[in-house]
Amino acid sequence: MAAPIAVALDAPDVETASRWAAAVAPHVSTLKVGLELYLRYGPAVVEAVRGARETALFLDLKLHDIPATVAGAARSVAGLAPAFLTVHAAGGADMVRAAVEAAPETRIAAVTVLTSLDEAALGAVGMRGPARDAVRRLAVLAVEAGARALVCSPQEAAMVRAEVGPDVTLITPGVRPAGAAQGDQARVATPEAALAAGADLLVIGRPITRAPDPGAAAAALAAELQKTGASPS
């Protein structure tokens, strides 16, 4: 079984993204297309990275606008059949609900607090207190509005799982194999720790895509997770 990893295809062009996708797809469950690549190439990039593969598509657009606009955006990409589409939980319950209703076949994944933000950064934008408090509030709000998936730091995964129960898919960015550079992520954990905390899907980008051989890097990580019992066999 493919490892529960969404490889972030944050490539400079569609050709590179397609090459990475072909290399890693045999080893991981999901391919993630982000905002930059989608804005540059539109739906064509989805078809390019998906090809004839069975790998799930994660469209990470982090929609955040008034409910009607988000509903229209969600409806416009629903035809691409993404398994997941992200919206910001901070957009409010009505906005999350609008996305859910506009794309019923897609799991709307509500982003709680970006993993690039530490408590000082949160305080600067008016979100006082520990990050986990904001994550908890936003997670509950989003699930009550119909979101079937949540995006949170691995450091908050156990707390979120306890709050929302077993049926919501928990997606964790900020995942770094032991020894990998932290980069622009502030709240991180290893893949094994994230899965142990209750994560269902790990978002991993640069440790795989910036490796000399992305396919080999994905295969090695998948094998390590299976060996440690963190990933289903």
Swiss-Prot record:
Its EC number is 4.1.1.23. Keywords: Decarboxylase, Lyase, Pyrimidine biosynthesis. GO terms for molecular function: orotidine-5'-phosphate decarboxylase activity. PROSITE patterns: OMPDECASE. The active site is at residue 62. CDD domains: OMP_decarboxylase_like. The keyword Lyase applies. It comes from the Bacteria. GO terms for cellular component: cytosol. One of its GO terms (biological process) is 'de novo' UMP biosynthetic process. It catalyses: orotidine 5'-phosphate + H(+) = UMP + CO2. SUPFAM superfamilies: Ribulose-phoshate binding barrel. Pfam families: OMPdecase (PF00215). Belongs to the OMP decarboxylase family. Type 1 subfamily. Homodimer. Catalyzes the decarboxylation of orotidine 5'-monophosphate (OMP) to uridine 5'-monophosphate (UMP). This is Orotidine 5'-phosphate decarboxylase.
